[in-house]
Amino acid sequence: MEIYLVTGNMNKKEEFLKMMDEELNVEFVNINLEEIQAQDIVEINEHKVKTAYNILKKQDNNKNKKRYVITDDTGLFISKLNNFPGPYIKWMQKALGSKGIADVVSRLDDNTCHAICTYSVYDGKDVHSFKGITNGKIVEPRGNNKFGWDNIFQPESLSKTFGEMTFDEKQNLSPRFKAFVQLKEFLMNEHKKYNNEF
């Protein structure tokens, strides 16, 4: 059983390794994937994981081996902007930066939002998707910006942005971690089933 996480983002790779059980061996592959244009973050990610799986399968001589390919996607959904930018946050971030996004939201009478992260895993037959959601608000930039908009996202009922938190503080709150817990449970169960077959 081989597990591949498709990412070229070193921060995501580092975070994934901190969360993953050592019992599961994960290979990281960097594949440039086209994303479909859609509002549904799960739909986008499921398309992405199938594309990645097919690319990896074509590159491998052993077409019959059991492989699980994982992709992730994240969105920031600003309430007063009808949940825009959602899955288009990376483009908005690229165009405006964190400060620009915070400036836009500061002109609204409501700065609430929610962040969603999805992991999708595909084994060539079935796609399984896992979603984590964290409610919060957009604030002026504070802290580091290791992950895109961390320095402007302040989780509900807290006074720190993700950018001001340590890894451990952020871990239990982040939508990525919430989705990851579900993904890890799924992979551990698949790993047990796979080992019982041999």
From Swiss-Prot:
Entry binding sites for ITP: 7-12, 48, 73-74, 90, 147-150, 170, 175-176
EC number(s) per entry: 3.6.1.66
Main EC class the enzyme belongs to: hydrolase
Cellular component, GO annotation: cytoplasm
UniProt subcellular location: Cytoplasm
Positions contributing to Mg(2+) binding: E35
Primary subcellular site in the record, as a coarse category: cytoplasm
Catalytic activity: ITP + H2O = IMP + diphosphate + H(+); dITP + H2O = dIMP + diphosphate + H(+); XTP + H2O = XMP + diphosphate + H(+)
InterPro entries: ITPase (IPR027502), ITPase-like_fam (IPR029001), RdgB/HAM1 (IPR002637)
The protein's role, per its UniProt record: Pyrophosphatase that hydrolyzes non-canonical purine nucleotides such as inosine triphosphate (ITP), deoxyinosine triphosphate (dITP) or xanthosine 5'-triphosphate (XTP) to their respective monophosphate derivatives. The enzyme does not distinguish between the deoxy- and ribose forms. Probably excludes non-canonical purines from RNA and DNA precursor pools, thus preventing their incorporation into RNA and DNA and avoiding chromosomal lesions.
Protein name according to UniProt: Inosine triphosphate pyrophosphatase
